[in-house]
Amino acid sequence: MAKLILVTGLAILLNVQLGSSYQLMCYYTSWAKDRPTEGSFKPGNIDPCLCTHLIYAFAGMKNNEITYLSEQDLRDYEALNGLKDRNTELKTLLAIGGWKFGPAPFSSMVSTPQNRQTFIKSVIRFLRQYNFDGLNLDWQYPGSRGSPPKDKHLFSVLVQEMRKAFEEESTLNHIPRLLLTSTGAGFIDVIKSGYKIPELSQSLDYIQVMTYDLHDPKNGYTGENSPLYKSPYDIGKSADLNVDSIITYWKDHGAASEKLIVGFPAYGHTFILSDPSKNGIGDPTVSAGPPGKYTNEQGLLAYFEICTFLNEGATEIFDATQEVPYAYLGNEWVGYDNVRSFKLKAQWLKDNNLGGAVVWPLDMDDFSGSFCHQGRFPLTTTLKRDLNVHSASCKASYRGEL
């Protein structure tokens, strides 16, 4: 018995010292600081002990070179990277691209070897100048949205050339190599059109898969934003609109499990019901829901805004089939995630030996704790706890600077 207690104690001690093998990545969006009053979120509001990686969204591109989008970005870079003073194990990445950025600048950049080298050299200079630890390529998407079919191959070429350049720069200067990650699509047709998965998996450090935005108001019926499993109403191609099917596809087609980072949304999609009495999954809708008070985007509510919706009397239902909740009040309907669904997904992630989780975005979690009354960052904290993510070097706590 004494020997068993000793072994158990050593295992616990080693776990505390070495930390989790899972990554917990968190996006910070540059426009979050512009939200009104209690919804405004700045780099100083970030708890430096919460995530293993912070990803700043987004940088831009000009003449095939990476660039900042505003002078304020430069101040944000300094504040974000200053968090590493309080957590020496924290890594920061700069994301380039995004949905609004579109595929055209990427398509032009990858089209010639000269353009690719111009971009790669600019990335190394830029990341080192502003003290980032790596890059997140958020091209939405190679081979789709007007991007030609050849971009599927050229994206792999870019990633291979960039990884090689990062390694050479590291060796030459005797410094840690820059990290290289890519956002990965969550729709099977887009994945097929855009990615040579085995090649990408070999060169990338991580692939952050967008396992969200799987149902939205454009569909004309209610559906969950990020269901873990399929609904009985999901037939045909819709049967793949769930986290389990998407990640399984990536794994089955050549992605290393430990490099797959599962997307966890800190927001939900909202709908206006055609008939308020028909308020389940798959019921007809007429439009997107009204914009949130703070996020001001039609068809979307941040998690902290959803808590207000619930506090106003909305009925919350937990869909045991898809393992995510939805809620409705009158003709308004929202499909989202909460602490319970994050816990279930975290366990599923561990059961499948995946690399970790990425929260999009951190600034839509209840960062102040004043809306949901579940503590600060309740969704992200759930992942931190359930994935056993911690940093022995991090002594600073959340200070909530403005």
From Swiss-Prot:
Q: Which UniProt keywords apply?
A: Cytoplasm, Disulfide bond, Inflammatory response, Secreted, Signal
Main location per UniProt?
secreted
Q: Look up the record and report any one GO term of the cellular component aspect.
A: extracellular region
Q: Which SUPFAM superfamilies match?
A: (Trans)glycosidases, Chitinase insertion domain
State the Gene Ontology terms under molecular function. Answer: chitin binding
Q: Which residues form the signal peptide?
A: 1-21
The induction text for this entry reads:
Up-regulated in response to IL4 and IL13 and during the allergic response.
Task: For this entry, list what GO says about its biological process.
Answer: carbohydrate metabolic process; inflammatory response
Q: Residues in domain GH18?
A: 22-390
Tissue expression summary: Detected in stratified squamous epithelium in the junctional region between forestomach and glandular stomach (at protein level). Expression is mainly restricted to stomach.
Q: What does this protein do?
A: Has low chemotactic activity for eosinophils. May play a role in inflammation and allergy. Has no chitinase activity.
Family classification:
Belongs to the glycosyl hydrolase 18 family. Chitinase class II subfamily.
Give the protein name, as stated in the record: Chitinase-like protein 4
| Organism of derivation | Mus musculus (Mouse)
